[in-house]
Amino acid sequence: MTPPAARRRSQFIDAVIDDYAAVHSTPPDPHQLELQRITREKTGGAAGMQIGDDQAMLMEMLVRAMGATRAVEIGTFTGYSALAVARGLGPGGRLLCCDISQEWTSIARAAWQEAGVANRIELRVGPGLETLRALPPGEQFDFAFIDADKTGYAQYYEEVLTRLRPGGLILLDNTLQGGHVVGDLPDDEDVAAIRFLNDAIASDPRVKVVLI
């Protein structure tokens, strides 16, 4: 059973229901719990950027179910989402992680090593868009996760989509912006960027979309 305090609560689901869902889901293992602890200890208020247990498990299951062997992540933070994706990859699978922070990704590197997935992950520190554009022509991905600066989402999406294999999957985090996408925050750049992207993807004939 996962202690409720270890979870990142949904902003849209009653706390009692959220706790019920946690009890009836596979809990995080010791490696994940330790990474959560270290992230809270080392990053302070920034720890809220870490995805929740339920999302991590869902990502691992999706990657495994689709038989993905090549994945990319834009925005790695302390490596919790990457740990989930790496665990779901098929034999010989590789995950490319892109992040701009040496400090936060040093936590990720140690966690991946401890969890036994470091050999599946390549970390490149630098602007994500530059990293993607520097990849060899024709390099494709089965799965992509975008969780970086919101004003850059549209460019990340386009760059990743051109490298996504037919039937591949792109996950974008924070696409509801805490519900503010339907609110009135005209001066918030992040919300405006996500609204723009949501509208663009919803009308993009190249993809099928679900926003949850």
Each language-model region and where it sits:
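A short alpha-helical cap/connector motif
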Residues: M1-F143, K150-L171, T175-I212
